[in-house]
Amino acid sequence: MQFGRAIAALAGIACALPVVIATPLERRFFGSHEEPRDVKWDTNHFTVAAGLCQATYCPSTKVGSKVGDDAKLLWYKGDGDDVQRALIFHSKTLGITVALEGTNTSSMVSTANDVFAVPVDVDYRFKDSVPKGAQLMFGFQDAYLKVADDVAKMVPKFKKEYNESRLTITGHSLGAAMGLVAAGHLQKVIHGGVHEVILFGLPRAGNKIYADWFDKTFGDRFHFIVNGHDWVPHVAPRILGYRQVSNQIWINPANSTNWKFYPGQENVHGCDSVVPEWGSFDDHQGVYFHTQIGASLGHCPATIGQD
């Protein structure tokens, strides 16, 4: 596991070099200057989503098991090695929820998804839904495509079984990047589309064309949460054309209850305003809305709102 963590950290640092050498003026040029605001949404949604993200890191989570008093696991696919885990829950708070696993740093295959930073066209499954020129990072899209068809098949089944109209997508780290891809795909192929998208520790996963389309499509149905000085949301680098989406919620200091909403893409007052802790996973695997998420630091069995 330490080797995998080292590879992931080195890859992140390599991707970050263009960010590190950029001047403060260059960094400010890219982003929104809107002032931070109070978080007006029901933060219990974020707390529950964090618990379901944590469950993806727990191989012992079996069909029928519960996460807190809120959610029951209905289906899963993936071994966390060749295929990232994709879990489908029925949640009282979030409805039918797809939770996607973050990087398994003991797996070279899983870690490789974070390294293949080549931008590629959006997959044929939903390419005609996005503007021409929209691109995603190869490793993130490829990781999702290994579970995409099965997820798209099972979601309607469970929506019907539970008489549920809501579909929520969540994920942490690599799982968050996969969630950004999944939202685009499932918005097209699932009747009623996606109700809510909540992502934690989200890397830059697409280019500006994709980010603009995503913002327009999902609006306030989407939020991503950054914890403290986490470096992951600062990669892949903008010099390769990647752009962070809007609707950042930044927890600062890390693991605290001090959170604010930062409108617009790459908001200069948000996490871009501090120097990330390159190579450290402490904030990345931190406490998000009273729930810790992380392969090594989070709880198994997963809990909701206990931190």
Name each model-derived stretch.
Residues 1-26:
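Fungal secretory targeting signals
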Residues 15, 93-94, 103-105, 174, ...:
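Conserved beta-strand elements of beta-rich interaction domains across eukaryotes
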Residues 70-169, 189-194, 216-220, 307:
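A conserved cap/lid and substrate-binding interface adjacent to the catalytic center
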Residues 21-106:
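Flexible, membrane-associating and regulatory peripheral segments of lipid-active enzymes
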Residues 211-307:
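Lipolytic serine-hydrolase domain surface
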Residues 9, 15, 46, 51, ...:
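Residue-level signal for mature regions of secreted extracellular proteins and peptides
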Residues 152-242:
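Serine-dependent carboxylesterase/thioesterase catalytic core
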Residues 52, 98, 147, 197, ...:
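A residue-level signal for conserved active-site and pocket-lining positions in enzyme catalytic cores
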